[in-house]
Each structure stands twice: as C-alpha cells, then as structure tokens.
Swiss-Prot record:
This is Olfactory receptor 14J1. CDD domains: 7tmA_OR14-like. The lineage of its organism: Eukaryota, Metazoa, Chordata, Craniata, Vertebrata. It comes from Homo sapiens. Glycans are attached at N3. Odorant receptor. Residues 1-23, 74-97, 159-194, 257-269 are extracellular. It comes from the Eukaryota. PROSITE patterns: G_PROTEIN_RECEP_F1_1, G_PROTEIN_RECEP_F1_2. The chain crosses the membrane at residues 24-44, 53-73, 98-118, 138-158, 195-215, 236-256, 270-290. It is found in: Cell membrane. One of its GO terms (molecular function) is olfactory receptor activity. The keyword Lyase does not apply.
C-alpha cells in the first residue's frame, strides 16, 4: 500500500481497483498500442520507401504518424505497466516528463493538422502557385516550426504546473499525469498562472480549428464547382479524412480541458481522455490509408513478390552501414 502522505510522486487511480479489470485494461491497451504502433510505422515506412509519395501532403502525413507514434507512447505503456503491477505510483520525474511530452506532442499535432489543411487548400484552391507555396524548403520549415512550437508549449506547461504548491493528497483520478486533474491538487488561488497558460493554449488551438474550418470552407466551395463527379469524389476522399481527424481530436481535447474540475473522479473524464490520447493515434492510419488509393497502391507494391527482395537488400545494406 502506498503511503500518500510521504510519497514524493503521485498515485494514478486509473480505471478500477479490481484486479480482473486491471488485467483487462492492460490487455485492451496493449492490443490498441500494438495496432497504433504497427499502423503508424507502416505509414512512415511506405511514405519513406515509395518515391511516388514524396510530396508535401505525404511528407506532413509522415510527420503526423510520427507524432501519433510518440503521443500514444507517452501515456499507454506506463498505464499498462501500472495495471499489470497493480500499482499506480508514478515518480515526480516521470510525471514531469509525461506532462512535458504529452503537451508538446499534443500541441505539435494540432499545429501539423493546421499545416495539412493549408496544404490541401493551396493544392486545390491555388494549384498554379502550389509548387511555389509548398516547396521542399517551406515544408521543412513548417515541420521544424511545428516541433519547436510544441516543445515550447510543453516546456512552459511543465515548468508552471510543477511550480504550483500542492495542498491535497497526491492522487490523480486518471491513467496518466493529466494537467486538469493535477490542478485539483493545487492550493487555492495558486494555479492562476497555469490557468492563464491553459487559456492561451486553448485560444491557440481554437485559432487553429478556425483556420482548418476556413480552409475547408474554401476547399469545398472550390470542389463543388468541379464539373466532373469523379474529380469531386477524389478530392473529397482526400480531404474528408483529415477534416474528421482534426475535428475529432480538437473537440475531445477541448471538451476535457475546458471542463471545470470537480473534486470527485468522473467516468466522463476517463472516457474523453481515451478519446484524445488513445483513439486518434490508433485510427489515423486506418482513416488515412483506407480512403487513399495512392497509399493502398504503395502498400500493395511494397508487399509484392517483385519488390520484397529489393526491400530486403536495402535493409541488409542499412544494417551493414
């Protein structure tokens, strides 16, 4: 039994105290994590290997998959280990790192989704200037800005959140170190800086959402003027998955962060945290690949008998270096 008064870390309550449910939770999360790992690694590999996919759209998609891979790895493996051991304790250093990487990667994901929507807008609404707008250098700078902005956001949240004096027991009613849940432990009126920073971050995310929506309003108005039904279908099949992913992620995360914290644990908190921490990284590979003919063709080519020997030779050459 963990001593709540003397421990320097935190106690993550997770989903249940019953041993059978803890094992079930660990198994479900393990299967989900392996699916997310496989799907995102497959997308990264396909885009890297197939030269036909070396375009801005797939370049950003590769970085989204990399972000998803890192994002789900921040929370799920720790939660699986805690459930298997029947111990929800997490050290202070682990919690600080988890908050930093969680906020950094979530912020980067919002930013990359915004960049991807602008890329689609430029490709469809300004096709004559697309190669100039989204040249390789601009794409690299956009991705670098995404990662730097996410890192700064995570650094600020971690620094401010862990400088707040804690007055309550170090019990977090979540399966990871969730900032809104941690604010419940803060002394009265001592977390105004974190609330101000959270408000700024939420405002930035809202601006990103508005940018995405405006981009797609312009995109759909342009698409509806395309005379060919086949052309409209092709554009919709490319754009709708991205719009769904962005809306789902931002809506679930926004609902969780904008809710007023209560003193008791809530099933709603746990459900919505799963919606924006576990489900998007798992479903994104499926959403982007199933409706994308180029991705499916590249996957078939990579798995074909003619291509497999060449892939093996490339891998052997890489390992020899």
């Amino acid at each position: 039994m963990v001593n709540l008064t003397s421990m320097s870390g935190f106690l993550l309550m997770g989903f249940s105290d019953e041993r059978k449910l803890q094992i079930l939770h660990a198994l479900v999360f393990l299967v989900t994590y392996l699916l997310a790992l496989t799907g995102n690694l497959l997308i990264i590999t396909i885009i890297t290997v197939d030269r036909r996919l070396h375009s801005p759209m797939y370049y950003f998609l590769k970085h989204l998959s990399l972000l998803d891979l890192c994002f789900i790895s921040v929370t799920v493996p720790q939660s699986i280990a805690n459930s298997l051991m029947g111990n929800g304790y997490i050290s202070l250093v682990q919690c600080i790192l988890q908050v930093f990487f969680f906020i950094a990667l979530a912020s980067s994901e919002v930013a990359i989704l915004t960049v991807m929507s602008y890329d689609r807008y430029a490709a469809i609404c300004q096709p004559l200037h697309y190669e100039t707008i989204m040249d390789p250098r601009a794409c690299r700078h956009a991705v670098i800005a995404v990662w730097i902005a996410g890192g700064l956001s995570g650094l600020m949240h971690a620094a401010i959140n862990f400088s707040i004096p804690l007055c309550g027991k170090r019990v977090i009613h979540q399966f990871f170190c969730d900032v809104p849940q941690m604010l419940k432990l803060a002394c009265s009126y001592e977390f105004i800086n974190e609330i101000a920073l959270a408000a700024f971050t939420t405002s930035a995310a809202f601006i990103c959402l508005i940018s995405i929506v405006l981009s797609y309003i312009r995109i759909f108005s342009t698409v509806l003027r395309i005379p060919s039904a086949e052309g409209r279908t092709k554009v919709f099949s490319t754009c709708l998955p991205h719009l769904f992913v962005a809306t789902f992620f931002l809506s679930a995360a926004g609902f969780e962060f904008l809710r007023l914290p209560s003193d008791s644990s809530s099933t709603v908190d746990l459900v919505f945290s799963v919606f924006y921490t576990v489900i998007p990284p798992t479903l994104n590979p499926v959403i982007y690949s199933l409706r994308n003919d180029s991705m499916k063709a590249a996957l078939r080519k990579m798995l074909s008998k003619e291509e497999l020997p060449q892939r093996k030779m490339c891998l052997k050459a890489m390992f020899k270096l």
